[in-house]
């Protein structure tokens, strides 16, 4: 009797998705041979909702280790909308369960971030056999020390900061680099340290613009003709941190500065007189070939997930804890975010180096 394994990639793409898919497939084929069939669910949960899936040939998993993006396609399907019946009159949860049954799946592997894991847990609670795999450049999935895609994004953001140094120095400017990360500052913290940023601003540590401006002025007085700010896109001021999201987004809109980076740059320029510019690498941080580290990590996660399938161990997500690959119950991690804690070792490293955290 053959086992039918469904695989989908959901949410934003990142380096390592294809490497993980490959790890799962190769490990399954090696372990089960022709007793396993892999069904590709196209474009994330949207494909599961609308019955968009296909049988995959073993040859499709060759040559994708180094390829960025995802061969299955992906789409954001917000968790908060899963129970909402829209204008199309589709009950999304019922539709996903129907596709699972029609495709004759024995289990479903969901590669994605926090939203993906919330939906994976929902499906698990609805009785489906589900396994999650942690993907995000934000590195903010609860219960795992690292997610695939993170290290490649750190490499990319670091290179951006590296390249900004020379132009900042040549023009005696303050350069604000906006790094991805709405709720967690891991990517900004790591790339900021790796790239030699002078000021690092992350969502978990609300900044005081006076301290930011003071850090720039202190560098100028010390003979430094430029400053580099690594700013998480989700950075909040001390004042904003006291408000509800709707309040501070409205205030930003009123001021004309919709992003934290834009406002910080204008404020620093006004307060210090230093010419200030913004650099937004944006989606470059989630594109391209995965780093060697992420290829290894993705392969580890994929092979471990294949083992879970073989052992009929469902309702969990793969994780790296203290350098060991393991599995956490979906119900224990869904809906939780792994933020940068106040006692984070890398925050202490930044402080010890004289890097301002605002």
Residue ranges and their predicted role:
Residues 1-9, 20-104, 115, 236-242, ...:
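A cross-family phosphate/adenosyl-ligand binding-site feature
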Residues 10-13, 41-46, 76-77, 113-116, ...:
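Short, ordered loop/turn segments at secondary-structure junctions
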Residues 99, 110-112, 120-122, 150-171, ...:
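Accessory alpha-helical/coil subdomains and C-terminal extensions
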Residues 20-24, 114-128, 188:
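Short Gly/Thr/Asp-enriched flexible loops that form oxyanion-binding sites at enzyme active sites
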Residues 298-310:
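Flexible loop/turn connectors
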Residues 32-33, 123-147, 151-154, 201-208:
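Short, acidic/small-residue loops that bind anionic groups at enzyme active sites
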Residues 8-18, 180:
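Short, glycine-rich nucleotide/cofactor-binding loops
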